[in-house]
Amino acid sequence: IVLLMVVTSNADRICTGITSSNSPHVVKTATQGEVNVTGVIPLTTTPTKSHFANLKGTQTRGKLCPNCLNCTDLDVALGRPKCMGTIPSAKASILHEVKPVTSGCFPIMHDRTKIRQLPNLLRGYENIRLSARNVINAETAPGGPYIVGTSGSCPNVTNGKGFFATMAWAVPKNKNKTARNPLTVEVPYICTKGEDQITVWGFHSDNEIQMVTLYGDSKPQKFTSSANGVTTHYVSQIGGFPNQTEDEGLQQSGRIVVDYMVQKPGKTGTIVYQRGVLLPQKVWCASGRSKVIKGSLPLIGEADCLHEKYGGLNKSKPYYTGEHAKAIGNCPIWVKTPLKLANGTKYRPPAKLLKERGFFGAIAG
């Protein structure tokens, strides 16, 4: 209960308020330090960890292809035969695979390129689609004619031999026609809506016996890609690979190195190669921007805010304390210490004498 006394006289004196009990509220002020007040409104909350959710008012993408069962996002990005599907549009995306890997196709040397980043690159776009046609006719590319190779490690939907939809394994029909001199193929821009074109390519290498059998050359091969001002060079490794399977596939003595290049609208890319090249086929056409945040699946319900440390948050207060991390959506602002808004008077103990002050003195106080 607050008792407010107002005494009116010729001097216009005003008395301060007093409470009938001790005040439990303390606020820190810029000029007076800690001050007891009769009431406060908390402005901060300390969240607890929760599951990630769909962001309210926008489409949120979890897996790149929700309907592609038993597929990692890298499987989808490379076009593994059994992982072909539609990627939904989204304004927000969850980075749920810290180290994405393929789960059932040809063994990839992940650490030699930036291929692990490909799913994250795609997540950063609002709209993503795979081109309907191939960017290059692999059978008649320079150095050909080629046979487009397949592998039992990449079974297609009918369980026959297959390969990634984004690449063609170019095996020369005449294996004795070695590519001693580098060959160059231009990669045209084929997206139709002014999107960024993400072109996937790579190369295959194996032990000396397999290299001679497939390509008629056991020497290390050289490869270069160039697009949008970025040039990358590789030299293949010959042999030294233990037999490896991925997801109960066939054992393979060889490895593939996979990379990608981003082509802006109307810009042509180039690939310089020798034997064992994986020529680009279907390309990703991507546009718009999607905000990306590290998180986990499944997405349950909706939330105002997605926070890397706390998951889905609903904004009950304008500020929060606790762990500071990246957040997207309608999020509270991080502060180091709790904030309070005083909505009462400055507390005066009842036993103290009320000090009368002039009108302007009361305002200044």
UniProtKB/Swiss-Prot annotation:
Keyword vocabulary terms for this entry: Disulfide bond, Fusion of virus membrane with host endosomal membrane, Fusion of virus membrane with host membrane, Glycoprotein, Hemagglutinin, Host cell membrane, Host membrane, Host-virus interaction, Lipoprotein, Membrane, Palmitate, Signal, Transmembrane, Viral attachment to host cell, Viral envelope protein, Viral penetration into host cytoplasm, Virion, Virus entry into host cell
Range of residues in the leader sequence: 1-11
Localization per record: Virion membrane; Host apical cell membrane
Any GO MF annotation of the entry: host cell surface receptor binding
One Pfam family hit: Hemagglutinin
Residues linked to a glycan: 36, 70, 156, 176, 243, 314, 343
Post-translational modification: In natural infection, inactive HA is matured into HA1 and HA2 outside the cell by one or more trypsin-like, arginine-specific endoprotease secreted by the bronchial epithelial cells. One identified protease that may be involved in this process is secreted in lungs by club cells.
Recorded topology in the membrane: Single-pass type I membrane protein
Superkingdom, natural source: Viruses
Gene Ontology CC terms, in alphabetical order: host cell plasma membrane; membrane; viral envelope; virion membrane
Gene Ontology biological-process entries: fusion of virus membrane with host endosome membrane; fusion of virus membrane with host plasma membrane; symbiont entry into host cell; virion attachment to host cell
Leftover remarks: Major glycoprotein, comprises over 80% of the envelope proteins present in virus particle. The extent of infection into host organism is determined by HA. Influenza viruses bud from the apical surface of polarized epithelial cells (e.g. bronchial epithelial cells) into lumen of lungs and are therefore usually pneumotropic. The reason is that HA is cleaved by tryptase clara which is restricted to lungs. However, HAs of H5 and H7 pantropic avian viruses subtypes can be cleaved by furin and subtilisin-type enzymes, allowing the virus to grow in other organs than lungs.
Protein family per UniProt: Belongs to the influenza viruses hemagglutinin family.
Quaternary structure note: Homotrimer of disulfide-linked HA1-HA2.
Main function: Binds to sialic acid-containing receptors on the cell surface, bringing about the attachment of the virus particle to the cell. Plays a major role in the determination of host range restriction and virulence. Class I viral fusion protein. Responsible for penetration of the virus into the cell cytoplasm by mediating the fusion of the membrane of the endocytosed virus particle with the endosomal membrane. Low pH in endosomes induce an irreversible conformational change in HA2, releasing the fusion hydrophobic peptide. Several trimers are required to form a competent fusion pore.
Protein name: Hemagglutinin
Taxonomic lineage from the root: Viruses, Riboviria, Orthornavirae, Negarnaviricota, Polyploviricotina
Gene name per UniProt: HA
